[in-house]
């Protein structure tokens, strides 16, 4: 058989099969020698490239450390590059087959939002539509780059006159929408609010070059993930029904870029994070709150109001103190525990505040105040992170996420919050929701409350909010010498002359605004005397009766002033609706030069919380802050003692990272209204579940009930019945012979967790002559593993313990109807004690509709928990 036919039919036979008897083996083909030579040359070249830098260092007498530094940078760069590529390929694989990825147990962080949150819809029809439109979207993007961005870059600088895009390819993978959420509560009737969970993972290729300098650069892949809000408003009674479309990101999206060419240096260590941050800042200037893109669909819509609406409110954050923070600094290689140098980072949308650093303190006190604008709610959340300052990398101490809907509802929240993602630690915050009012009725009261003095500077707490919309300018002078010289700085003109700039060229105007010490600057508009800005600016005002708004138009090209203006804020106070919308003539400028602006002043005031009649009783159910020391003695009787009655009512507890709920409207049908006495005794509300006590948060030395006590449940039940017969001894026991337990139960669809708040117990039976040492143990059946067990602290020698502890179970709302809460009140006899027993049980079936709304109620304890009678 010939070699050609054997190659066609299959793999070549082995040498033994190929050699015929009496025929010497064929000589080796000459081609094999050339392959060896090529491999040898490749190996020699590789070795030479590795050794040559060492020779160069020795030849020039340089230090060997330069080679080590270069090697470290190369390895670090390759590692970062590999991580980026792996994330890109993983995301691409997930987008190609989402269902298969889910079945193969992909990491939960990579799953789309609709998997975690039931209120977010998958909307696959939208992805199919985008996929069909993607080629035409790519054509639009390419047209935008070539006809808009490319000419703008060329005109920005003479050195970039040969700039052009050589290739623009957005890739075949379209933008994907992982979930859509439509808001139906707490929104205006004339608007529709949608949140889109967008994800773009594309092999995008954008190449550019500057021919004059033989410079080539580009991008070969982009990843973008974030939550984009789309607002359709106002709804009108005519076609097209929607007046305008507003698009923006609620917070900075996640961005990752792989560079090519000259820009590949941006992937080097130290520059990779910086480059992404700069690009994110550019995106934030256009698409992250308070900035937005507004597309008018009808001509008579007030675009200025839609693009830059007045903020919904101002959040005053009192960043007070923390307790029991984790220790991160160690000595003698961890043998000696040190302390931490904590500081906090507070984020609200695009606004970031950082506290001072408290050295070597696990119970720091900052006592700092920040004021942040709230532009959109629901949707915006207050994010707080605590760090331990170190010389190399700051250590994480815990975080906190607070839904602002609850803060707006309560107006003032002064509370201790347990830190998430931390084994210990709690943070004391006071949050005030300030409502912008268009009247001066409360101005004197507000000025008195913040102790506003005669100081012109904007240093103290704010009494008002100044919102300024800069529209355009008219008839700006082209020649600085045309301006009134009394208002000119001669040095500025001389500087422009020395710089060789043409005096009569078109200006590059921008505007400076200042109120007190706060200064803000508009964008620069190039080569125009009729600029159009359409920008908004917001200032916090300490005392509007005494402060002024100073405006100055400057020319970046000539480094000179083109006119100025001063507006006393008291003039705005005298205007109708505290608003001025007009053209303002500029001083020290041309005769017809003017600025078109809309200026609004809003008085910041803490309004009283407004609750519906159904929510009036829930507002009284409050819970005190965490005590610094031991729990104070609890009363032995359920009726309130005088010491309790005259205590000032504590502020309401606020749940972190939860959706707006409807108070206690979801009380089960069998639940009856609580009496005023019970309301006074209750120490926690439905909205109060930010104290999340997971097993990792509990003290390590807390006594743990025996596992055998759960296994031998029939024995414990029999002993409890025997104890009841002994207590009865011929007498008639009351309606609740084993006592009662008060619980709050609610399912958070946003966090996908069931939250159970154990408030207190009353009238428990005495396990011994000295009383009982009760604690509460909880299972979410059928899960009875040790990891699924939750338990409260133990309180000694009391029959009326007050716990006020919150426990969380990860369970979806549809699955909840198949689960049962197993709650047992037990006596803890101490470590290794045999005096442990059951004080009462409660088995509670969970209804999905009721759990979504939540309720707070007293329940009777029974021997086996099969009769969960609801107390009136």
Swiss-Prot record:
Residues 297-417, 442-588, 737-859 form the C2 domain. Residues 1-31, 77-872 are cytoplasmic. The lineage of its organism: Eukaryota, Metazoa, Chordata, Craniata, Vertebrata. It comes from Xenopus laevis (African clawed frog). PROSITE patterns: C2, SMP. Interacts with fgfr1 that has been activated by fgf1 binding. Interacts (via C2 domains) with the AP-2 complex (via an alpha subunit). Identified in a complex with the AP-2 complex and fgfr1. Ca(2+) 3 binds at residues 390, 392, 394. It is a peripheral membrane protein; Multi-pass membrane protein. Anchored to the endoplasmic reticulum membrane by a transmembrane hairpin structure; both N-terminus and C-terminus are cytoplasmic. The C2 domains mediate lipid and calcium binding. The N-terminal C2 domain binds calcium ions and is important for calcium-dependent lipid binding and interaction with membranes. Two calcium ions are bound at a high-affinity site and a third calcium ion is bound with lower affinity. May bind up to four calcium ions. In contrast, the second C2 domain apparently does not bind calcium. The third C2 domain mediates interaction with membranes enriched in phosphatidylinositol 4,5-bisphosphate and is required for location at the cell membrane. GO terms for cellular component: cytoplasmic side of plasma membrane; endoplasmic reticulum membrane; endoplasmic reticulum-plasma membrane contact site; organelle membrane contact site. The chain crosses the membrane at residues 32-52, 56-76. InterPro entries: C2_dom, C2_domain_sf, C2C_KIAA1228, Ext_Synaptotagmin_C2A, Ext_Synaptotagmin_C2B, Extended_Synaptotagmin, SMP_LBD, Synaptotagmin_SMP. One of its GO terms (molecular function) is phosphatidylethanolamine binding. This is Extended synaptotagmin-2-A. Gene3D superfamilies: C2 domain. SMART domains: C2 (SM00239). Residues 664-681 have a biased composition (Polar residues).
């Amino acid at each position: 058989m010939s070699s050609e036919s054997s190659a066609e039919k299959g793999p070549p036979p082995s040498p033994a099969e190929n050699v015929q008897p009496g025929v010497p083996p064929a000589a080796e083909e000459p081609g094999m020698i050339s392959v060896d030579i090529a491999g040898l040359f490749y190996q020699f070249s590789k070795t030479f490239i590795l050794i040559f830098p060492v020779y160069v260092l020795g030849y020039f007498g340089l230090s060997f450390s330069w080679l080590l530094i270069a090697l470290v940078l190369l390895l670090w760069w390759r590692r970062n590059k590999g991580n980026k590529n792996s994330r890109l390929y993983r995301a691409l694989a997930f987008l190609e087959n989402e269902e298969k990825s889910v079945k193969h147990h992909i990491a939960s962080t990579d799953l789309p939002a609709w998997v975690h949150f039931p209120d977010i819809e998958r909307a696959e029809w939208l992805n199919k539509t985008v996929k069909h439109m993607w080629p035409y979207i790519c054509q639009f993007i390419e047209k935008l780059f070539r006809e808009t961005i490319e000419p703008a870059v060329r005109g920005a600088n003479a050195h970039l006159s040969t700039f052009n895009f050589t290739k623009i390819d957005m890739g075949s993978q379209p933008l994907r929408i992982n979930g859509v959420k439509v808001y139906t509560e707490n929104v205006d009737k004339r608007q529709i609010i949608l949140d889109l969970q967008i994800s773009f993972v594309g092999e995008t290729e954008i190449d550019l070059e500057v021919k004059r300098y033989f410079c080539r650069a580009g991008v070969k892949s982009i990843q973008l993930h974030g939550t984009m809000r789309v607002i359709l408003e106002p709804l009108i009674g005519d076609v097209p029904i929607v007046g305008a479309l507003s698009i923006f990101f609620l917070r900075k999206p996640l961005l990752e870029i792989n560079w090519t060419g000259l820009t590949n240096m941006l992937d080097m260590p130290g520059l990779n994070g910086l480059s992404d941050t700069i690009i994110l800042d550019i995106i934030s200037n256009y698409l992250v709150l308070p900035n937005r893109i507004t597309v008018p669909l009808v001509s008579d819509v007030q675009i200025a109001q839609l693009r830059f609406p007045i903020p919904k409110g101002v959040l005053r954050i009192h960043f007070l103190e923390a307790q029991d923070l984790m220790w991160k600094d160690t000595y003698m290689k961890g043998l000696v525990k040190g302390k931490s140098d904590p500081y906090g980072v507070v984020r609200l949308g695009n606004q970031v505040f950082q506290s001072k650093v408290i050295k070597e303190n696990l119970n720091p006190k900052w006592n700092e105040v920040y004021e942040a604008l709230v532009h959109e709610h629901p949707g915006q959340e207050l994010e707080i992170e605590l760090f331990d300052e170190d010389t190399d990398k700051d250590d994480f101490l815990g975080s906190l996420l607070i839904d602002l809907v609850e803060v707006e509802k309560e107006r003032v929240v002064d509370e201790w919050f347990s830190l998430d993602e931390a084994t210990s630690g709690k943070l004391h915050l006071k949050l005030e929701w300030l409502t912008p009012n268009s009247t001066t009725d409360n101005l004197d009261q507000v000025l008195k409350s913040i102790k506003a003095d005669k100081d012109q500077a904007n240093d103290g707490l704010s009494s008002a909010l100044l919102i300024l919309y800069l529209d355009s300018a008219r008839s700006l002078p082209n020649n600085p010498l045309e301006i009134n010289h009394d208002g000119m700085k001669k040095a500025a003109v001389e500087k422009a002359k020395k710089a060789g700039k043409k005096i009569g060229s078109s200006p590059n105007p921008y505007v400076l605004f200042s109120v007190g010490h706060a200064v803000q600057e508009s964008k620069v508009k190039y080569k125009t005397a009729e600029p159009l800005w359409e920008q908004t600016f917001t200032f916090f005002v300490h005392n509007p009766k005494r402060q002024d708004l100073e405006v100055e138009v400057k020319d970046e090209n000539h480094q000179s002033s083109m006119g100025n203006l001063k507006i006393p804020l008291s003039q705005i106070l005298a205007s109708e609706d505290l608003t001025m919308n007009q053209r303002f003539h500029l001083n020290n400028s041309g005769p017809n030069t003017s600025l078109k602006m809309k200026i609004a002043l809003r008085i910041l005031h803490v309004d009283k919380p407004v609750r519906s009649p159904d929510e009036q009783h829930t507002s009284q159910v409050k819970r005190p802050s965490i005590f610094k020391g031991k729990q104070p003695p609890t009363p032995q009787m359920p009726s309130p003692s005088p010491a309790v009655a005259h205590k000032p009512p504590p502020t309401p507890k606020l749940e972190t990272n939860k959706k707006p709920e409807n108070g206690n409207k979801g009380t089960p049908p069998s639940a009856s209204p609580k009496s005023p006495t019970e309301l006074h005794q209750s120490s926690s509300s439905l909205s109060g579940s930010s104290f999340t006590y997971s097993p990792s948060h509990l003290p390590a030395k807390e006594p743990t009930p025996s596992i055998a006590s759960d296994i031998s449940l029939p024995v414990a039940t029999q002993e409890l019945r025997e104890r009841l017969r002994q207590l009865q001894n011929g007498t008639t026991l009351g309606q609740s012979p084993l006592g009662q337990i008060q619980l709050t139960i609610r399912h958070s669809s946003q966090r996908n967790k069931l939250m159970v708040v154990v408030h207190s117990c009353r009238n428990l039976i005495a396990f011994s002559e000295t009383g009982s040492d009760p604690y509460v143990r909880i299972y979410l059946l059928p899960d009875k593993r040790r990891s699924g067990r939750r338990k409260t602290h133990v309180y000694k020698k009391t029959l009326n313990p007050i716990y006020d502890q919150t426990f969380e179970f990860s369970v979806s709302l549809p699955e909840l109807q198949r689960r049962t809460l197993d709650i047992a009140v037990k006596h803890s006899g101490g470590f290794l004690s045999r005096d442990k027993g059951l004080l009462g049980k409660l088995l509670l079936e969970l209804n999905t509709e009721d759990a979504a709304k939540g309720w707070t109620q007293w329940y009777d304890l029974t021997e086996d928990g099969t009769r969960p009678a609801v107390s009136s």
